[in-house]
Amino acid sequence: MMKVLVDYPSEEEEFVIAQRVTGAATAVAAVASMGQLGELQQECRKVYVDPSLMQYAVKLVSATRRPERYELAEIAKYLTYGASPRATIGLIEGARALAFMRGRAYALPEDMTGLVGDVLRHRLVLSYEALADGLTPDQIIQRVMKRIAVPDKPLAPGQSA
């Protein structure tokens, strides 16, 4: 669903990792049952995602496939393949999960905008021209995000303007 960039650990952190992996097995206590995890998934699916936020996800992903439709013709030469509809689903589900973890029953734009790079970066296939110009998927994503307007904060269900 995502490709999260993680820096290398410090030497101290790497030492701890090496100790844990190569040392004796330690007992691990379950913190949740499979049933409880299933219940959490069902609760997460109840988080409201406003149609304007869903449309934002669709536009972000679509702009990687048809950049000229979004006045992004300058990036078309850098993309061999854009993201598929699975990226749209990943953005929506990711925003829903973040909202749930943040204790809300509805997703806000910031729940989605922080995930765009993680969801899209491994789904874009850059052209040889992009590689020759030293461009990264994240740079292309930033151009798309600057062009596609973030929706106004959607109201929670049942609220009126």
Report each predicted region and the residues it spans:
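Conserved C-terminal "switch" segment of AAA+ ATPases
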Residues: K3-I75, M101-A105, P109, A130, ...
